[in-house]
Amino acid sequence: MLTPKKLALAHTLGPVVVDIAGTVLTEHEIRRLEHPMTGAVILFTRNFASAEMLRALCGAIHAVRPGILITVDHEGGRVQRFREGFTEVPSMAACRTAGDQTQARLAAAGYVLASELRAAGVDMTFAPVLDIDYGRSAVIGNRSLGSDRDEVERNARALMSGLRLAGMANCGKHFPGHGWAEADSHVACPTDNRSAAEIRRDLSIYRGLALELESIMTAHVAYQCFD
């Protein structure tokens, strides 16, 4: 039962992002989508059987809650949840090795992945990755847009231009930076033992893109100088 106390707590915490178990909605999931504090849905590989079924699932979600955000981690390379019927977008590391064609390639990658997702009913992908590739983090690795802050910022701007052209919002991640932490935060608690000044170098990417970023995803990392 949603008591006044629970409702007050929910409003303090804000809307939550929920997941779906399979390729069709269950009655329980429909009730959860109807809850006023459900703000978005995140899809995974388990929610994908075909492009047609994905469109049907997204349509069903939007029918229950018109305007709810349907999201996915679909960056290209090894982080691409949907394969069959979708373009195999190269990793960001592959895209950024095209010399003077790098910006055009990244813009094209952003447009292709965003336009295909939009056609399926997905509203947003969690991209770009704004973590600097220090050569330490395997979970970031070739997902990174550069090995220094200027390269990351420049390449992210190109990728976001493609997303924008297809009508998709962006999400910079993993704030304030996951490139130095070695552990995979999906299975462990990574730590970053750098100084505050060094971490602020990573964070400056977000400052440089502040007028263009529409959302951010935080890192699940313990920053020893702060935490």
List the model feature ranges, each with a label:
Residues 41, 73, 117, 159, ...:
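Conserved, mostly hydrophobic/aromatic
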Residues 37-152, 180-191, 219-227:
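Enzymes and membrane/adaptor proteins characterized by extended Gly/Ser/Thr/Asp/Glu-rich
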Residues 99, 141-165, 190-207:
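Acidic, His- and aromatic-enriched active-site or binding-groove loops in soluble protein domains
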Residues 2-27, 159:
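Boundary/entry segment of secreted carbohydrate-active catalytic domains
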Residues 12-14, 37-39, 66-68, 122-123, ...:
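Short, well-ordered coil/turn segments that N-cap beta-strands
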Residues 30-36, 58-65, 165, 209-211:
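Acidic (Asp/Glu)-rich catalytic clusters
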Residues 169-197, 202:
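Phosphate/diphosphate-binding glycine-rich loops and adjacent basic-rich segments that engage nucleotide
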Residues 21-34, 105-116, 199-206:
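Short, acidic/polar
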